[in-house]
From Swiss-Prot:
It comes from Prochlorococcus marinus (strain NATL2A). Gene3D superfamilies: HUPs. The keyword Translocase does not apply. Belongs to the QueC family. One of its GO terms (molecular function) is ATP binding. This is 7-cyano-7-deazaguanine synthase. Its EC number is 6.3.4.20. The lineage of its organism: Bacteria, Bacillati, Cyanobacteriota, Cyanophyceae, Synechococcales. It is an enzyme of class 6 (ligase). ATP binds at residues 10-20.
Length: 225
């Protein structure tokens, strides 16, 4: 296995971009992996491509897998409305996409083993998305066990690490780190709506804007992009 190569699941948002840059700063070669999964907010794919180029990643691969074929989420089924009433506590919002992270990580593991990468960088964040079942520490721990059991390198004792450096970070800390790393925040995309401009009302926009205001960077909020 070639050491110091990371597969970064790159959505086009601030979390995945920050995780990728932390890996690069640590001396890792980074291969970006993005997914066209039938999401209504396709603009995130252009953001991912722009970020991959701007960050000078080793490679950037986009995989098409149509999760909109069966829907189950407002992100993949346009007949369902994106929630705009504000973040609801203790509930899983309809923006949760069934099995999405599980599928993405599985593909990432395949790519990592094929390319000789030793870890996968995930931008998942339990602090902001505590309602999502696949962004929690127990999910990550269980998937790591599966990854070790389901791969040749894992069985040989050289398992691919599922690495989520932002798992317990507040959103303000993520943006502060992104600024330190000189990530072009204005090139990232967070909005769930499939419009040309961020809506400023969906949960993702609200979380982003709140954090940016708290660190004094209102100039990067959704209404200014």
């Amino acid at each position: 296995m070639i050491e110091h190569t990371t597969i970064a699941l790159l959505s086009g948002g601030i979390d995945s971009a920050t995780a990728a840059c932390i890996a690069m700063e640590a001396g890792q070669k980074v291969i970006g992996l993005s997914f066209d999964y039938g999401q209504r907010h396709l603009k995130e794919l252009q953001a991912a491509a722009d970020l991959a180029k701007n960050l000078n990643l080793e490679d950037h691969i986009t995989i098409k897998i149509d999760l909109s074929s069966w829907g189950g989420s407002s992100l993949t089924d346009t007949s369902q409305a994106i929630p705009t009433q504000g973040i609801q506590k203790n509930t899983i919002p309809n923006t949760y996409v069934p099995g999405r992270n599980t599928i993405f990580v599985a593909i990432g593991l395949s790519l990592a083993e094929a390319r000789g990468a030793n870890r996968i960088a995930l931008g998942i964040n339990a602090m902001d998305y505590s309602g999502y079942p696949d962004c929690r520490p127990d999910y990550l721990k269980a998937y790591q066990e599966l990854a070790n059991l389901s791969s040749r390198v894992g069985r040989e004792g050289n398992g691919i690490k599922l690495w989520a450096p932002l798992l317990d970070w507040e959103k303000t800390k993520i943006f502060e780190e992104a600024l330190r790393l000189k990530i072009p925040i204005e090139k990232t995309w967070s909005c769930y709506q499939g419009e040309s401009k961020p809506c400023g009302k969906c949960d993702s926009c609200r979380i982003r804007d709140k954090a940016l205001k708290e660190i004094g960077r209102e100039d990067l909020c959704s209404q200014n992009i």
